[in-house]
Regions:
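ATP/NTP phosphate-donor binding region
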Residues: 1-99
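Hydrophobic aliphatic residue packing
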Residues: 15, 24, 107-108, 140, ...
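Glycine-rich nucleotide phosphate-binding loop and flanking beta-alpha elements
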Residues: 51-52, 107-109, 134
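Short glycine-/acidic-enriched loop or helix-start segments at secondary-structure transitions
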Residues: 54-56, 111-113, 137
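Short, basic, helix/turn surface patches
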Residues: 96-103, 152-158
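Glycine/serine-rich anion-binding loops at beta->alpha junctions
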Residues: 98-117
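A glycine/threonine-rich phosphate-anchoring loop and its flanking beta-alpha core
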Residues: 114-160
Length: 160
């Protein structure tokens, strides 16, 4: 179960990207066992359903600089919604030396990666994927895409 064990690094590997190499770490267990500094200095973007299900377990992250709770559906993964997310982060004093921490599946990963690649001309991000597809697609592949108008996944980035 996601929130029951410690969070050891069980394996890692390097990816060679056209934007430069980066390391992928695989971890299992309790995401709240991440180092406290990372949790409390990050602006967290989390899937609403995940937060609803594990509300008690996620209490420690409620004191992060900002917590942006998003319902993981296609309408929220759109260019029209980006100003809402950017305004939230700016209002909560996002700085270039801080990072975005995404907790959720592919939609949350896409939103967070797209924001991280574009806000303040690019900031650091960290993913905690909760689905296998999100792990392989947006996390290891470091790609994100959002919808614009009637076009699905038309705007995107590769952000190692």
């Amino acid at each position: 179960m996601l929130l029951t064990e410690d969070l050891p690094v069980s394996n890692c590997f390097d990816v060679q990207s056209h934007k430069g190499p980066y390391r992928v770490h695989f971890m299992t267990g309790n995401i709240l066992a991440m180092d406290e500094e990372t949790l409390l200095s990050s602006h967290i973007i989390i899937d609403k359903k995940l937060l609803d299900i594990y509300e008690q377990q996620f209490k420690p992250i409620l004191s992060a600089p900002s917590l942006l709770v998003i319902e993981a559906d296609e309408k929220n993964k759109s260019l029209d919604k980006m100003p809402v997310y950017v305004n939230h982060l700016v209002k909560n004093k996002l700085r270039r030396n801080q990072k975005l921490l995404a907790i959720g599946g592919g939609i949350i990963q896409d939103i967070t990666c797209f924001l991280a690649a574009n806000i303040l001309r690019g900031i650091e991000w960290q993913f905690v994927p909760t689905t296998l597809l999100a792990q392989a697609d947006s996390c290891i592949g470091s790609k994100s895409s959002i919808n614009c108008g009637d076009s699905k996944n038309i705007l995107g980035t590769f952000t190692p």
